[in-house]
Amino acid sequence: ICSTVIPMLKIGIDAMGGDYAPHVVVEGALMALRHIDSDSRLVLFGDEGEIRRVMEEHGAPSDTFDIVHTTEVITMDDHPAKAYNQKTDSSIRVGYKYLKEGKIDGFASAGATGAMLVGAMYSAETIRGVIRPAISALISTLDGGSFLLLDVGLNVDCKPDVLDQYGLIGSAYAEAVLAKANPRVALLNIGEESEKGNLTTKAAYELMADNGCYNFVGNIEANEIFTGRKADVVVCDGFVGNTILKQTEGFYELARMRGINDDYIDKLNYEFVGGTAVLGINAVVLIGHGRSS
């Protein structure tokens, strides 16, 4: 009788990423241990002394995690490419090194998004044919469903062919992972008509309409995306997508401050989203919200 031996799954975590690192990252890793298989192992990258202090505060045994000590951190104020190349002992850079060498099976960080993009491009590498990877956000809609928004911050400037490709990537992800049959793909714009928008969106519209590899339903305006009536996938550049995402978060916080209790509004809480996958690369990379607790 032949048996298949499943190797131990090693998940890499940037312990220094996020506004409240390393405390909340280590605490989150300890919480995650309750939900992952016993044959999986968490590998934390960061200042070993700080990581172990948090572990001791929670009474965690010293062998709870594999810890890779690093001495540098790429901050939000750093230039992404320069910092990634110069801070060779940063938690992000070393984490990607381990991912490339196959020492971990996936890497997650709530740190600098720009540096994570650089690492995804040059360490994880893009899938053949992909121009630029993207990150997406799954946002709840009023009809009880959700839509996929991409890009939400990895590429603030996108050429028309990149937006067209995001339509294909988003469609494939929505179908394979979100189980949406023939997902409807729309381009976020200032009007529904094909001639609306700037030079980039006008050119992108033509490419998307002619693509034929996914179900393009045309332009969609921002006031329609939360209804769920028109699109399952909404495409935009990272500047616009991140603005939509932050506006959604701001609306949630404003509603809570006003004492509004509503099941739908609660679904807009970014704390409920552990992270989002980087789409279009040959590795499993997750980017978390920097403000997450």
Question: What do these predicted regions represent?
Answer:
Residues 60-104:
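Phosphate/nucleotide-donor binding subsite
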Residues 6-52:
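N-terminal phosphate-binding or glycine-rich loops at protein starts, especially the Walker A/P-loop
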Residues 121-145, 149, 227-293:
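Glycine-rich phosphate/nucleotide-binding loop
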Residues 99-117, 195-196, 201-268:
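Glycine-rich phosphate-binding loop
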Residues 21-25, 89-102, 106-120, 131-135, ...:
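Short glycine/serine/threonine-rich phosphate/pyrophosphate-binding segments
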Residues 13-23, 84, 154-164, 286-293:
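Short, glycine-rich nucleotide/cofactor-binding loops
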Residues 23-24, 36-43, 156-222, 232:
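Glycine-rich phosphate/diphosphate-binding loop of Rossmann-like nucleotide-binding domains
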